Amino acid sequence: MSMVYFNIFMAFIVSFMGLLMYRSHLMSSLLCLEGMMLSLFVMMSMTILSNHFTLASMAPIILLVFAACEAALGLSLLVMVSNTYGTDYVQNLNLLQC
């Protein structure tokens, strides 16, 4: 494994650990998810380019489309929660609370 792949893999791990540790606020969770998607996109693009695997060249674009949809839904959820409750705590999303 080259150093570039290792750094990208470590970026994914750091984003994943951030998602596990800082999950009280919705904005920090969304930022960690975006970091994970960015590192996946870069890793997928570099793997396809280095292996000359042209049949899968559409996969990074599809991943970017899903990342954009995830970001749009996450930000709309953030706006809805912050307008309703005044904060962006993830615990406000629990519908089973009384």
From Swiss-Prot:
Asked if the record carries the keyword Lipid biosynthesis, the reply is no
UniProt topology in membrane: Multi-pass membrane protein
Localization annotation: Mitochondrion inner membrane
**Subunit composition?**
Core subunit of respiratory chain NADH dehydrogenase (Complex I) which is composed of 45 different subunits.
* The protein's name: NADH-ubiquinone oxidoreductase chain 4L
* Family to which the UniProt record says this protein belongs: Belongs to the complex I subunit 4L family.
Give the CC-aspect GO terms. mitochondrial inner membrane; respiratory chain complex I
The main place the protein resides is mitochondrion
The protein's matches in InterPro entries, at most eight in alphabetical order, are given as:
NADH_UbQ_OxRdtase_chain4L/K, NUOK/Mnh_C1-like
Pfam families the UniProt entry points to: Oxidored_q2 (PF00420)
EC number(s) given by UniProt: 7.1.1.2
